[in-house]
Amino acid sequence: MSKVTVIRPKKTFSLNDLKEIWAYKELLYFFAWRDLKVRYKQTAVGVMWAIFQPFMAMVVFSLIFGKLAHMPSDGVPYPIFVYTGLLFWQFFSSSLSDVSNSLILNQAIVTKVYFPRLLLPLAAIATNLVDFFVASIVLVGLMFYYGFLPHIMGLSIIPVLLVISFLASLGGGLFLASINVKYRDVRYILPYFLQMLLFVTPVIYPSSIAGKYAWILSINPMTGVIKAARAAVLGTEPINWFLLELSLLAVAVLIVIGVVMFKKMERYFADII
């Protein structure tokens, strides 16, 4: 007589969930590798699109805001100023979007096979992490071109900034993915939301331009990340640790909300997706 395994849905996130994700780490790798191959399948330049997108955005912003509008850039050349911000913004926004759609894009698997559903959002971010490192090549080139030699201690904070960006996109993405399963409007609204969020994040302008309203920008967790990245890489100013702590606090709230919502809806994914 064959053994029957009953898998009961869990309402809360626990250490066992992390152990389960670790047990399925090879499947996580497979999902990430599959997403990466599908993204650049039948393209002429392949993964180089990861460079092309932020690079062209840098060119357009440099012409419009740097040359025509004479946007201040904290005393550094505008192209490298904006590209540093774009690099982290692209990672965050692409990850948030991909995590939000990760369940519905894999509905055939979700409805048929059991595995930790968190693997799909994590794989989506892992794919964008590869794009981040590829796109970083341009930043290195710009640093050599403009003669920037960042301090080793400054660069050591980059992994921390990546973790904050990772968690911000994961927390927000899990919340949106949970809603997106039932209400597909999310996938249409999100691009417009991200466009608006770009302009309330100091990507194309320094936060100092907001004057007395700069505190509003600090609510955005990516504000602290982007300012710290510029401080670390370009030396525009000392790292604002208080602002970075605010980013961590905002990310912690996002993670709690996202995980709670995801675990609450997880039992219904296969039924309503």
Regions found by a protein language model. Name each.
Residues 1-273:
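Hydrophobic transmembrane alpha-helices and immediately adjacent juxtamembrane helices
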